[in-house]
Amino acid sequence: MYGIPDRLKPLSAAEEQVLLALWDCKPPASRRDIGARLAAKGWAAATVLNFLYRLEEKGWVICTKEQNRNLYSPTVTRRAYGVFTMRQRLDTVFGGDLAQAVRALVSESGCSQS
């Protein structure tokens, strides 16, 4: 659906943050690299590792071994995920009506339509 395989399970907000950090790392990335991107959250290394494990179980991430460390890669692109999440919100909130969503965004944001 929208560039995202149907087999993928929904993400929690925290899992999404870890996936975003992974994309920012220019994958494949180690747990340490991903954790560094999430330092402001104050999560322990074990917490980041737990979220990576969940993402792997849900099919969003694959883990490969290189020497004695695990490297993580997303199974979908950031763009595909963005389209998928926007489409979900568009369908849920605006019944799939893009024009209605854009009108609401323009009127609520104070942007001009010109």
Per-segment meaning from a language model:
Residues 1-8, 84-87:
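Short, Lys/Arg-enriched N-terminal segment that forms or immediately precedes the first helix
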Residues 9, 22-28, 41:
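Short helix-capping/hinge SLiMs at alpha-helix to coil transitions
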Residues 10-14, 66-85:
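Short, cationic-aromatic polyanion-contact patches
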Residues 16-21, 33:
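Pre-recognition alpha-helix immediately N-terminal to the DNA-recognition helix
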Residues 28-37:
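Short acidic, hydrophobic short linear motifs in intrinsically disordered regions
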Residues 36-45:
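Short helix-coil junctions and helix-kink-helix linkers
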Residues 56-66:
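A short, conserved structural fragment
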Residues 84-114:
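Amphipathic alpha-helical dimerization/coiled-coil segments
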